Amino acid sequence: MKKPELLVTPTSTADILPLIQAGATAFLVGEQRYGLRLAGEFSREDVTKAVEIAHKEGAKVYVAVNAIFHNDKVGELGEYLAFLAEAGVDAAVFGDPAVLMAARESAPDLKLHWSTETTGTNYYTCNYWGRKGAARSVLARELNMDSIVEIKENAEVEIEIQVHGMTCMFQSKRSLIGNYFEYQGKVMDIERKKKESGMFLHDKERDNKYPIFEDENGTHIMSPNDVCIIDELEELIDAGIDSFKIDGVLKMPEYLIEVTKMYREAIDLCVENRDEYEAKKEDWIERIESIQPVNRKIDTGFFFKETVY
């Protein structure tokens, strides 16, 4: 039985080696000009350094090129993708067909992973993009376990799912927070380093707090809870899911390292010793709950809910 890749989104190049030592086998990085909702901002120099560190340790580096592109940016894609290929990244993650077209012209040997956040909901669509050149499909977070397994059974490409972290609920290209501050006569710095400013939308009826931040790609509203299925990995591993992702957006490096250690142990035991995996489930959940940020509970997302599509 194969072990799935353990993919983590690091906050900086300083995270790469500690996360590899914690058990990560792949990383998703990028810069906000081309990628969406990343845990950290990786310049070209950072990407090159991340590849150097990861490859030395036998890990992979993927770069997010999954932003919503308008005419003003499409002319840059070819040159950026050529840089990624030259830097030796293991794949570019895309959603916009413009990236696929640019890659064919400027970086034909660069491996591509297809990810659109919400529309990876069936194996026909996954296979369509596979036949267009994608080696992997990243599934929507709103799918339940049965749907994920069925997709994997019929997929012609690798399948990636998110197993831990917050998920995006809303994105607008508009500067909603900046406009609100401007209306109040205030100034807001929307640089990437300011996104951990602790702003929330408060739903009093459900008593939920939704993290909200703004960057070059607009305004993003995130889920009030973190997905955590460390105790529900059996069916996914048995199905042969290729990659498990821990999303580190709005998380501290120390948190990511501890969670990665636990998922590494869980994956290894689930493959090698099911009885011991079963025995340790409660301990992992308790340990994760003990390091969760204030007011952020964990749940199983849509894995055991009726699919909303």
Swiss-Prot record:
Superkingdom of the organism of origin: Bacteria
Loss of function: phenotype: Deletion mutant lacking both trhP1 and trhP2 shows reduced 5-methoxyuridine (mo5U) formation in tRNAs.
The keyword Protease is assigned to this record: yes
Entry's EC annotation: 3.4.-.-
Name by which UniProt lists this protein: tRNA hydroxylation protein P2
Family in the record: Belongs to the peptidase U32 family.
InterPro entries referenced in this protein's UniProt entry, alphabetically: Peptidase_U32, RNA/ubiquinone_mod_enzymes
Keywords: Hydrolase, Protease, tRNA processing
One GO MF term: peptidase activity
A biological process from GO: proteolysis
Coiled-coil residue windows: none
Purpose: Involved in prephenate-dependent formation of 5-hydroxyuridine (ho5U) modification at position 34 in tRNAs, the first step in 5-methoxyuridine (mo5U) biosynthesis.
The species this protein was found in: Bacillus subtilis (strain 168)
Native organism taxonomy: Bacteria, Bacillati, Bacillota, Bacilli, Bacillales
Family annotation (Pfam families): Peptidase_U32
EC primary class: hydrolase
Gene name of the record: trhP2
